[in-house]
C-alpha cells in the first residue's frame, strides 16, 4: 500500500547567484504539510530556480532549506525525500509503463516482485490499471503524465515537485489532467510544490499561490485572495486581465473606502488606512455596460467582439480605455455608441498608486 507522510518545506533567507547575476536575493517561505502550493510568475522570476534548489539540483549561496524539519541545504538530490515530475515526463521509451514506475523502486533496493506490485498499485492510483504493459509511445500525453506522477508517488516522498507538468498538453487535456492532479492530491494528502506560468492552472489546482517577481515574493495567498484582492498592479495584471485606473480616496470607514474614479464614486474594500491618490484594479467582468444617460461613468464604444458565451468591449472613458467582458449579453452595444458604465461590488481592488 502506498502511504505518504507529507512534510513541510521551509526556506530561510535563501540566496542564489549565477556568476554576477542574482536569481534569488533573499527568499523566505513556509509550505505546510499536505498542501499544494504553486510557484507562479513570468519567465525569469526565479520559480524554477527555487524548485531546483528544493530538489537538490542547485544549492544556495546562503540560507537554509528544510524538508520535514530536516536541514537539507547542502544534501545531494538523491538524499532528499522528494520526487519530481518533469515537464518532459522523462519516461524510458523502451520500457513499459509498469517498468517505468517500478524503476525507481528497484533502484532504491526493493526486490523486483515487490517493486512491480507497488508499481501496479501506483498505476491504479492514477487511473491506469491494466495499462502497465503499454510503452510510452502507446499512451496519450495525459496518460504519460500520469505514469510520471505514479512513478514519483510510489517512492512515498515527503514532498512531490511538479515542474510545468501540463505544458506539453493541449488546452482541453490540460483542464482534464489538472483536475486529476488536484483530486489525487486531496485524496492522498501529499505535499506538492507546483511550478507554472499559467494563471488559470495555478488558480485551479492550488491551496496557496506564491507569485514571484525578480526572485522575490510579490504576493502569497489563496487563489481567490490573489485574484480578487491583488496587492499591486503587477499582481492584478498577472492574475488574469485587469483594468488599472487612477482614483482618489475620498473617505474611509473601517475596511471600506469611498473612491472617486473620474466623475463616478464607488465603495471598495481596502487594506489598512488609505488616503489621496491610488489605483483601482478592475476585472473586465466587474464592469456593467448600459445605455447612455444613466448614473455612472460615461463612455463610447470603440470595438466589440462576440465570442459565443460573452461579448467583449473596448470603451473609451475619462480614465482611459477599459476592456469589458459582458456575460449577460442582455443588449449588444454598437461600435461608436455612447454608453454608461458601472462597477460591481466584486472583482475590484484598491492598490497603491
From Swiss-Prot:
Enzyme class: translocase
Membrane topology: Peripheral membrane protein
Keyword Cell membrane tagged: yes
InterPro entries for the chain: AAA+_ATPase, ABC_SmlMolc_Importer, ABC_transporter-like_ATP-bd, ABC_transporter-like_CS, Mo/tungstate-bd_C_term_dom, P-loop_NTPase, Transp-assoc_OB_typ2
E.C. numbers: 7.2.2.7
A Pfam family it matches: ABC_tran
Keyword Amino-acid biosynthesis assigned: no
Subcellular location: Cell inner membrane
PROSITE patterns (alphabetical): ABC_TRANSPORTER_1, ABC_TRANSPORTER_2, FBPC
The ABC transporter domain, residue ranges: 9-239
GO cellular component term of the entry, any: ATP-binding cassette (ABC) transporter complex
Annotated ATP binding sites: 41-48
Known function: Part of the ABC transporter complex FbpABC involved in Fe(3+) ions import. Responsible for energy coupling to the transport system.
Protein name according to UniProt: Fe(3+) ions import ATP-binding protein FbpC
Source organism per UniProt: Agrobacterium fabrum (strain C58 / ATCC 33970) (Agrobacterium tumefaciens (strain C58))
Taxon lineage: Bacteria, Pseudomonadati, Pseudomonadota, Alphaproteobacteria, Hyphomicrobiales
Amino acid at each position: 500500500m502506498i502511504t505518504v507522510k507529507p512534510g513541510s518545506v521551509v526556506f530561510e533567507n535563501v540566496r542564489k547567484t549565477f556568476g554576477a547575476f542574482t536569481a534569488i536575493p533573499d527568499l523566505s517561505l513556509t509550505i505546510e504539510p499536505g498542501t499544494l502550493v504553486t510557484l507562479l510568475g513570468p519567465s525569469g522570476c526565479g520559480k524554477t530556480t527555487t524548485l531546483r534548489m528544493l530538489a537538490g539540483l542547485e544549492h544556495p549561496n546562503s540560507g537554509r532549506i528544510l524538508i520535514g524539519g530536516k536541514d537539507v541545504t547542502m544534501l545531494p538530490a538523491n538524499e532528499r525525500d522528494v520526487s519530481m515530475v518533469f515537464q518532459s515526463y522523462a519516461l524510458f521509451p523502451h520500457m513499459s509503463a509498469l517498468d517505468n514506475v517500478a524503476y525507481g523502486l528497484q533502484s532504491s533496493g526493493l526486490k523486483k516482485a515487490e517493486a512491480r506490485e507497488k508499481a501496479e498499485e501506483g498505476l491504479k492510483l492514477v487511473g491506469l490499471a491494466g495499462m502497465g504493459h503499454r510503452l510510452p509511445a502507446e499512451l496519450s500525453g495525459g496518460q504519460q503524465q500520469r505514469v510520471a506522477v505514479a512513478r514519483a508517488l510510489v517512492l512515498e516522498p515527503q514532498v512531490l515537485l511538479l515542474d510545468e507538468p501540463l505544458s506539453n498538453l493541449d488546452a482541453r487535456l490540460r483542464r482534464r489532467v489538472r483536475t486529476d492532479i488536484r483530486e489525487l492530491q486531496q485524496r492522498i494528502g501529499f505535499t506538492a510544490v507546483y511550478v507554472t506560468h499559467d494563471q488559470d492552472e495555478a488558480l485551479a489546482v492550488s491551496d496557496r499561490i506564491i507569485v514571484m517577481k525578480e526572485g522575490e515574493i510579490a504576493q502569497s495567498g489563496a487563489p481567490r485572495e490573489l485574484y480578487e484582492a491583488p496587492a499591486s498592479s503587477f499582481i492584478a495584471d498577472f492574475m488574469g486581465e485587469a483594468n488599472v485606473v487612477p482614483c482618489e480616496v475620498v473617505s474611509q470607514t473601517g475596511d471600506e473606502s469611498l473612491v472617486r474614479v473620474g466623475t463616478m464614486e464607488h465603495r471598495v474594500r481596502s487594506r489598512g488606512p488609505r488616503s489621496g491618490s491610488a489605483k483601482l484594479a478592475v476585472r473586465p467582468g466587474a464592469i456593467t455596460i448600459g445605455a447612455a444617460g444613466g448614473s455612472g461613468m460615461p463612455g463610447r464604444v470603440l470595438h466589440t467582439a462576440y465570442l459565443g458565451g460573452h461579448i467583449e468591449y473596448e470603451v473609451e472613458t475619462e480614465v482611459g480605455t477599459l476592456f469589458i467582458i459582458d456575460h449577460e449579453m442582455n443588449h449588444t452595444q454598437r461600435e461608436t455608441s455612447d454608453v454608461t458604465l458601472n462597477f460591481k461590488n466584486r472583482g475590484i481592488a484598491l492598490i497603491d498608486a
